[in-house]
Curated annotation (Swiss-Prot):
Function: Produces ATP from ADP in the presence of a proton gradient across the membrane. The alpha chain is a regulatory subunit.
Organism: Nitratidesulfovibrio vulgaris (strain DSM 19637 / Miyazaki F) (Desulfovibrio vulgaris)
Keyword Hydrolase among record annotations: no
InterPro entries tied to this protein: ATP_synth_asu-like_sf (IPR023366), ATP_synth_asu_C (IPR000793), ATP_synth_asu_C_sf (IPR038376), ATP_synth_F1_a_nt-bd_dom (IPR033732), ATP_synth_F1_asu (IPR005294), ATPase_a/bsu_AS (IPR020003), ATPase_F1/V1/A1_a/bsu_N (IPR004100), ATPase_F1/V1/A1_a/bsu_N_sf (IPR036121)
NCBIfam families in UniProt: atpA, PRK13343.1
EC nos: 7.1.2.2
Protein name as catalogued: ATP synthase subunit alpha
Length: 502
């Protein structure tokens, strides 16, 4: 094959015309040292705090420390392939994660990459993980209920949309179970749920995902997982990644719920990073800004005012205590940031009272305004009744003779405790809760044996659903107990009692 001379010259001319000189400038540096997920980099003089740097092999790192002669970088992945002398490139970008409906139903890592084997994530929008919380003017007070389906919480420590309610307790007291029930209860509310697993075992996260899938809740839930085997920087950043994904719905006028399981492990990961970055340690060796670590995260949960779309983000952070010590550093920090706490106690758990909620120590500081009127009417005195019952039960142990009124309070209290027990993964609709609380607090269960209370409640609710569905529907729509509903409910319970056999 011969090419003519004029053809060669034509090809060369075309090549010259299409040649474009492109100079790409990037500021580079060199790795001084690396270990435990932290790298020291020399030479990137203009790097900014929280900026991403690119290491060999595409590994990203986030700038945390800016010092005179080098920068401290948290590596967002395994550091095994990085060695001293490796080149590092500035990206000029802030760490961002995918947001939008595409993340729903997926299990992601803190970088927003899918780890569930269901194919790539086709996200159209990305947002930075560190965003400013809404200001004072942008907010509105909490006034809409966010039912959890758990009787003890919805009656005595109600949660509203936009609230931060801490779930606190020792290990193995059912903290995660409470939060999973809260997710299951959102099936028909349109609230999007996000579950952030920080420092959990992989088996635990797999079990949570499996449970949500089994109950049909995975379609409106996203799991962000930074397990115990992940490097500390990923455990630290995972909560912010999840928050950014959830905020997307708050900002477009929808409602979202986010669960951080748990912030104790996030604080431990942050402590590890801070000590490796040679930041000065404070109380319990945590760095001085560990309060800010949690406050800037939890302040992003808010009820937004009507002019900004009236969306909300509700947060349920979990804190694990050691031997019930709520006065330790991290628990007191998070208690002071949140709008109340649900305290779970091992003694109650072991006594078979599950969920093991200590009513005396649990409180909701803003949820009362969000509680529906019907629930206020039936559960208003419940906390007081239970507190009196606990006090009298301790006194009655001495075996002294009790008068009729005291005995009646003890009997009613024992029935209330029994009524508040609830099986796992069975959240109860609010109208059914109101009906059973009404029967208990108005003395309609006083003649039912304590051991038969749960059977009585289940059969009574079945009776109401099948034969008197109009009563439950009226409670659901009117959200209050007027004289007519009350009379019909009382008559229905009396009718059911005639045929009930303990």
């Amino acid at each position: 094959m011969q090419i003519k001379a004029e053809e060669i010259s034509k090809i060369i001319e075309e090549q010259i015309q299409s040649y474009e000189q492109r100079v790409e400038m990037s500021e580079t540096g060199t790795v001084l040292s690396v270990g435990d997920g932290i790298a020291r980099v020399y030479g990137v003089r203009n790097a900014m705090a929280m900026e991403l740097l690119e290491f060999p092999g595409g590994l990203m790192g986030m700038v945390l420390n800016l010092e005179e002669d080098n920068v401290g970088v948290a590596l967002l992945g395994e550091d095994t392939g990085i060695k001293e002398g490796d080149p590092v490139k500035r990206t000029g970008k802030i760490f961002s994660v995918p947001v939008g409906d595409e993340v729903m139903g997926r299990v992601l890592n803190p970088l927003g990459q899918p780890i569930d084997g269901l194919g790539p994530l086709e996200a159209k929008e990305f947002r930075p993980v560190e965003l400013k919380a809404p200001g004072i003017i942008a907010r509105k007070s909490v006034h809409q209920p966010m039912p959890t389906g758990i009787k003890a919480i919805d009656a005595m420590t109600p949660i509203g949309r936009g609230q931060r309610e801490l779930i606190i307790g020792d290990r193995q007291t059912g903290k995660t179970a409470v939060c999973i029930d809260a997710i299951l209860a959102q099936r028909d509310t349109g609230i999007r749920c996000f579950y952030v697993a920080i420092g959990q075992k992989k088996a635990t996260v797999a079990l949570v995902a499996d449970t949500l899938r089994k109950h049909g809740a995975m379609e409106y839930t996203t799991i962000i997982s930074a397990t115990a085997s992940e490097p500390a920087p990923l455990q630290f950043i995972s909560a912010y990644s999840g928050c950014t994904m959830a905020e997307f719905y708050r900002d477009k006028g929808d409602h979202a719920l986010i669960i951080y399981d748990d912030l104790s492990k996030q604080a431990v990961a942050y402590r590890q990073m801070s000590l490796l970055l040679r930041r000065p340690p404070g109380r319990e060796a945590y760095p001085g800004d560990v309060f800010y670590l949690h406050s800037r995260l939890l302040e992003r949960a808010a009820k937004v005012n009507d002019s900004l779309g009236a969306g909300s983000l509700t947060a349920l952070p979990i804190i694990e205590t050691q031997a019930g010590d709520v006065s330790a550093y991290i628990p007191t920090n998070v208690i002071s940031i949140t709008d109340g706490q649900v305290y779970l106690e091992p003694n109650l758990f072991n006594a078979g009272i599950r969920p093991a909620i200590n009513v005396g120590l649990s409180v909701s500081r803003v949820g009362g305004a969000a509680q529906i009127k019907a629930m206020k009417q039936v559960a208003g005195t419940m906390r007081l009744d239970l507190a009196q019952y606990r006090e009298l039960a301790a006194f009655a142990q001495f075996g002294s003779d009790l008068d009729k009124a005291t005995k009646q309070k003890l009997d009613r209290g024992a029935r209330l405790v029994e009524l508040l027990k609830q099986p796992q993964y069975q959240p109860m609709p609010v109208e059914q809760q109101v009906a059973s609380m009404y029967a208990a607090t108005r003395g309609l269960m006083d003649d039912v044996p304590v051991l038969a209370i749960r059977k009585f409640e289940a059969e009574m609710l079945d009776f109401l659903k099948n034969s008197k569905a109009d009563i439950l529907n009226d409670i659901k729509t009117k959200k209050a107990l007027d004289a007519d509903i009350e009379d019909r409910l009382k008559a229905a319970v009396a009718e059911f009692k005639k045929g009930f056999q303990a």
